[in-house]
């Protein structure tokens, strides 16, 4: 690895190292064999919890061991203890899981087991779990597992309190994006929150006004992002999600009460802005692709067929995309086929 000095080992040192590794492999294989035999026998005795701990200390990504651990708790441990004892046991289990999360913050099976513990705990502490998500995302703001887990925790708090945290969570994603625009997980979370916030508004007129306000705020934020870093794919994907709502068949809360004429105006404004960026960044494939897609969508909304000049301009943009991004040539050729079919 870079920055690490390689030390040349003598023959004797190599043999000693190989012997140690061989011993570790044999130990691990022995544990796996014991686990497989015990589970095959459906041996759910509490003593096998230690076996699962040893295996998970070796490799926390072994989902079948996590499953067996839960089977032991459900079949042998829980039936024998009181609610308070069960809570104490699961508190210790959560501490164990947290120790794994700190070292392996992106292993699905660890998060899955934590959720199971909380769902089986008599008195789950969701506020503490929210603090855990903040620490996870503070360490890595783009950790998809951390964002997914946060959505889960928020849903549990909302259900317990019969309330909505959507607006607060929107503020949280805004802070995360302000720190780093290139945060696809935060932007993805935003797509879910926007529709939730709009659905909270019961009055149709108020919902329409709020939809326009949110759309314009989101576009302003994205404009700043694309001009700051035009090659950031996460920002363009989010922009496409926003503008995709202008599709004539879109009935999502964000755009459903905005007229076709207003959708056309939004598209035209975005096209002008992207053309301006394209002049500064002529090799940017995101600009090229967005111009083709949005101009074609605009024609559809206007119920007009593209002119020969339109087709020629879009074809030149597709050719540019293939040139600057040849690895995705198949995708761009499919786009070209769609362009060719627009006049048929």
UniProtKB/Swiss-Prot annotation:
GO MF annotations in UniProt: Rab geranylgeranyltransferase activity; small GTPase binding
Keywords: Prenyltransferase, Repeat, Transferase
Residue runs in coiled coils: none
Hydrolase keyword on record: no
Catalysed reactions listed for this entry: geranylgeranyl diphosphate + L-cysteinyl-[protein] = S-geranylgeranyl-L-cysteinyl-[protein] + diphosphate
Any GO BP annotation: endoplasmic reticulum to Golgi vesicle-mediated transport
Pfam families to which the protein is assigned, alphabetical: PPTA
PFTA repeats: 44-78, 89-123, 125-159, 165-199, 214-248, 266-293
A single cellular component GO annotation: Rab-protein geranylgeranyltransferase complex
Keyword Repeat in record: yes
EC number: 2.5.1.60
Record-stated family: Belongs to the protein prenyltransferase subunit alpha family.
Function: Catalyzes the transfer of a geranyl-geranyl moiety from geranyl-geranyl pyrophosphate to proteins having the C-terminal-XCC or -XCXC, where both cysteines may become modified.
Quaternary structure, from the entry: Heterodimer of an alpha and a beta subunit.
Protein name: Geranylgeranyl transferase type-2 subunit alpha
Originating organism: Schizosaccharomyces pombe (strain 972 / ATCC 24843) (Fission yeast)
């Amino acid at each position: 690895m870079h920055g690490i000095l390689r030390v040349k080992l003598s023959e004797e040192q190599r043999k000693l190292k190989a012997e140690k590794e061989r011993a570790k492999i044999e130990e691990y294989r022995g544990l796996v064999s014991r686990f497989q035999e015990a589970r095959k026998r459906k041996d759910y005795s509490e003593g096998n919890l230690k076996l699962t701990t040893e295996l998970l200390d070796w490799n926390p990504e072994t989902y079948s061991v996590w499953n067996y651990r839960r089977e032991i708790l459900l079949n042998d441990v829980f039936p024998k203890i009181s609610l308070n004892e069960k809570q104490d046991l699961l508190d210790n289990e959560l501490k164990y899981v947290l120790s794994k999360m700190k070292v392996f913050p992106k292993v699905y099976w660890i998060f899955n087991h934590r959720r199971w513990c909380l769902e089986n705990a008599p008195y789950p502490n969701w506020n503490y779990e929210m603090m855990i998500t903040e620490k996870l995302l503070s360490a890595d703001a783009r950790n998809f597992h951390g964002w997914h887990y946060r959505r889960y925790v928020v849903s549990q708090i909302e259900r317990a309190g019969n309330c909505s945290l959507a607006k607060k969570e929107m503020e949280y994603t805004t802070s995360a994006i302000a720190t780093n625009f290139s945060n696809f997980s935060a932007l993805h979370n935003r797509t879910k929150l926007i529709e939730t916030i709009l659905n909270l508004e019961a009055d149709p007129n108020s919902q329409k006004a709020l939809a326009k306000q949110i759309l314009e705020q989101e576009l302003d934020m994205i404009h700043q992002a694309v001009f700051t870093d035009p090659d950031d794919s996460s920002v363009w994907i989010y922009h496409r999600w926003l503008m995709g709502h202008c599709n004539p068949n879109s009935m999502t809360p964000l755009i459903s009460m905005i007229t076709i004429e207003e959708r056309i105006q939004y598209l035209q404004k975005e096209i002008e802005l992207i053309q301006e960026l394209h002049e500064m960044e002529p090799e940017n494939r995101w600009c090229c692709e967005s111009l083709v897609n949005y101009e074609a969508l605009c024609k559809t909304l206007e119920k007009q067929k593209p002119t020969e000049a339109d087709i020629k301009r879009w074809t030149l943009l597709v050719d540019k995309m293939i040139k600057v991004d040849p690895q995705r040539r198949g995708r761009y050729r499919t786009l070209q086929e769609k362009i060719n079919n627009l006049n048929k």
